[in-house]
């Protein structure tokens, strides 16, 4: 068995570095969890004036294996490289993990790279059903499938939802074709969701959308009742499937304005969706944790007791970046991508859309599909 510990300022009650160092001296195998942000503070690698002895000892310790999760983040700076160089001793094995390693690939030889992606995952999922002649394999268009706990052999990939990407041209959904970016002459989310600001704007108008009528028309279009529509809230079946969605918008002011506008629409007044705004200007561990707790509470998930009432609630989470990487919100079944363009960084886009591909089972029903509603078709096709 392994002993585990975290950095001293962690409040989880786990052992600290010195506890597991003593365990290691006594022949016990140990695991130590520490954040890159914590180690980057050390003066040893050029960080802030932090002479913490613990940080020095962690960096100087002779580790057998160092695993860097989300290795595409914060490791390519001078401080990040300094941390890695200090941890990497002669004989230390290094494992870099990333779902979007685009900025790392040129630093490794081909034989050093192991790739397991969504396409392989879904291929193995289908192949397993074919090899085992699984007649119960899901062929239903439904987003949730019943779980059969009496199956003799269970597909090990069955909990991993298939992703569907649907594209729409927002400018054609409303009369927004005339709303164009001044520099490019093309439609842009930033202009569409532009918020009135400045001292020359009447106080009662500040914080409202400049093109409020068009934004409101867009929201109404999303939930306009229609049997053959593919908009996420256009019929009762879709509304049940998309109880909990993530909407990615251009910025903080835009998220604030959209929350106020949504709360005036039938999505909130009749369908009882609760809007949770987690958009913020900064992203540290504490703020991300607070935002996650805020979302889970609104959804009806209690982390302490493990209770899950997400099938009884409805939420829309608004973000301009927060909770779009390294976070799991299992009840999310769709993301509405309402920012950026075809030049959006691939890593940003992929990290965001795969927030909704997390496994989720509740009351015997398992999420078998998840959706991306992308309102910039050029992005999804490039």
Where does each model-flagged region fall?
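Conserved C-terminal RecA-like helicase domain
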Residues: 1-36, 43, 48, 52-58, ...
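A short beta-strand-to-loop transition that corresponds to the Sensor-1 phosphate-sensing loop
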Residues: 33-38, 97-101, 251, 319-323, ...
